[in-house]
Regions:
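Flexible, glycine-rich beta-alpha linker
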Residues: 1-15, 39
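C-terminal substrate-binding subdomain of Rossmann-fold SDR/epimerase-dehydratase oxidoreductases
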Residues: 22-148
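Conserved catalytic helix of short-chain dehydrogenase/reductases
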Residues: 19
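Short, conserved clusters of charged catalytic residues that mark active-site
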Residues: 2, 15-16, 115, 127
């Protein structure tokens, strides 16, 4: 299973969601790489959990009959979101503007990621559904409650 840019409550403090939210909340600059020309397939953690659960409940016997002892599935929202739009959602939910520190792209990074979930939909009738606006709202609500 390949997960794409997972975010949500209890996320790692070294990941973008926490770093951006915490910086904006505390009036610190947000480091924005590639001068904001980045896109990511942001996937809410609840969708990842549901995807893993759905796959684990799938029929092992059916896969064995097909000779499929392993298969690769992407779990992602199936849509790239501009990094600056993601930051705007955080700003909206915190009711604060971000101080953006525009930086060059980091070595080895890519400008865009996107999860093709066609196999997941075909084999398991599952597609992550949490839109970024909804997921960011849930995350910021959790953050404000947890760090009050």
């Amino acid at each position: 299973l390949r997960f794409f840019t997972v975010y949500g409550p209890w996320g790692r403090p070294d990941m973008a969601m926490f770093l951006f939210t915490d910086a904006i909340y505390h009036n610190r600059p947000v480091k924005v790489f590639n001068h904001g020309k980045m896109e990511r397939d942001f996937t809410f953690v609840d969708d990842i959990v549901k995807g893993v659960d759905t796959i684990l409940k799938g029929s092992l016997d059916q896969r064995k009959e097909k000779g499929e002892f392993y298969k690769l599935y992407n779990i992602g929202y199936n849509k790239s979101i501009k990094l600056l739009d993601f930051i705007k959602e955080i700003e909206l939910n915190l009711n604060k503007g971000a101080q953006k520190e525009m930086l060059p792209i980091q070595p080895g990074d890519v400008e865009k990621t996107w999860a093709n979930v066609d196999a997941l939909i075909r084999d398991y009738k599952y597609k992550p559904e949490t839109a970024v606006a909804e997921g960011v709202k849930k995350y910021v609500s959790w953050y404000l409650d947890y760090y009050k």
